[in-house]
């Protein structure tokens, strides 16, 4: 099922929407130079983690998945596999799980939580609330 159209607010409709990498970047990764820049950084992070088999799900939220022409950055939630061990990562990949370094080096905001965590549902509920306290959609990207 394709990603839904934007609401009048510029957000996706409430819910967790699914997209593969191709559909995700086709929808959100072009239109302005800033979108292309953010998409390039996001694509790079996906390419770094995909072959490692450590990610169960990738959830994207925030201005990158809105109609906003110039999103400042992308916001990612890495939902890691239960066997995930950050200490086994290369330095290049480890920075993608450090909020300060990921922001500085890739211009992305990151959170991570293990798959099966009792707090995952609560976290997703929180991420789906805008600064104006309205509900918005999130996108789960299938790597």
Question: Residue locations for each model-derived region?
Answer:
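Catalytic core of pol beta-like nucleotidyltransferases
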Residues: 1-59, 65-72, 80-143
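Aromatic/basic-lined ligand-recognition segments
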Residues: 77
